[in-house]
């Protein structure tokens, strides 16, 4: 592996992942720190509850694009490397960590679900569609974004395996899935208590 190249790609992926679209939307539209409202997250769900559908859609698309960019960057610069898939794995992990712990916001960001969607699309689009279907079914049944995200994250490594994706991508699904579930630990507590809000509720996600 070309370590200087890999480290540069991973650093760029972290910085891209850490771009705080939700925070900037809050500052631009209402001059608020969105982390002080709702769930305290900078992600699209909290933006939806705090700022409305239009800003939430824009933040969602931007966060998905961050994931796509990280994979594109890794594949473009390291595509010819024998270790290219492993560099993509590192870029993916760096992007989700950047979104959750952005250097620009004192390491307090979102839960990395949307950026992970972009990463899955860039790595293996059939897996992305399968995981999206899992999310969609769970959300349709419960109307709870966090529950759908947790189940989809847990299903991601299995989806990579069933689609016979390269080992580094399956490993990303495992590590990234565990990370996202861990980021939702507060939501899990509320789910167990029966207090986790559904979409449309004023309470925080």
From Swiss-Prot:
GO terms for cellular component: plasma membrane. It comes from the Bacteria. SMART domains: G3P_acyltransf (SM01207). Pathway: Lipid metabolism; phospholipid metabolism. Catalyzes the transfer of an acyl group from acyl-phosphate (acyl-PO(4)) to glycerol-3-phosphate (G3P) to form lysophosphatidic acid (LPA). This enzyme utilizes acyl-phosphate as fatty acyl donor, but not acyl-CoA or acyl-ACP. PANTHER family: GLYCEROL-3-PHOSPHATE ACYLTRANSFERASE-RELATED, INNER MEMBRANE PROTEIN YGIH. NCBIfam families: glycerol-3-phosphate 1-O-acyltransferase PlsY. One of its GO terms (molecular function) is acyl-phosphate glycerol-3-phosphate acyltransferase activity. It is a multi-pass membrane protein. Signal peptide: none annotated. The chain crosses the membrane at residues 5-25, 54-74, 87-107, 117-137, 138-158, 162-182. The keyword Transferase applies. GO terms for biological process: phospholipid biosynthetic process. This is Glycerol-3-phosphate acyltransferase. Probably interacts with PlsX. It is found in: Cell inner membrane. Its EC number is 2.3.1.275. InterPro entries: G3P_acylTferase_PlsY (IPR003811). It is an enzyme of class 2 (transferase).
């Amino acid at each position: 592996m070309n370590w200087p190249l890999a480290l540069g790609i991973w650093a760029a992926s972290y910085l891209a992942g850490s771009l705080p679209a939700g925070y900037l939307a809050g500052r631009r539209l209402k001059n608020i720190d969105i982390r002080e409202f709702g769930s305290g997250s900078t992600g699209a769900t909290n933006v939806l509850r705090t700022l409305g559908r239009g800003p939430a859609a824009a933040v969602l698309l931007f966060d998905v694009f961050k994931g796509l960019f990280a994979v594109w960057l890794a594949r473009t610069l390291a595509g010819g490397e024998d270790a290219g898939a492993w560099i993509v794995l590192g870029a993916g992990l760096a992007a989700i960590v950047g979104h959750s712990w952005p250097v620009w916001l004192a390491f307090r960001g979102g839960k990395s679900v949307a950026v992970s969607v972009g990463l899955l699309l860039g790595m293996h689009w059939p897996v992305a569609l399968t995981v999206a279907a899992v999310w969609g079914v769970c959300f349709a049944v419960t109307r709870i974004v966090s529950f759908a995200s947790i189940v989809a994250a847990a299903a991601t490594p299995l989806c990579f395996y069933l689609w016979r994706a390269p080992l580094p991508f399956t490993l990303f699904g495992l590590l990234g899935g565990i990370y996202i579930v861990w980021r939702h630990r507060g939501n899990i507590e509320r789910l167990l208590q029966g207090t986790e809000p559904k979409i449309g509720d004023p309470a925080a996600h």
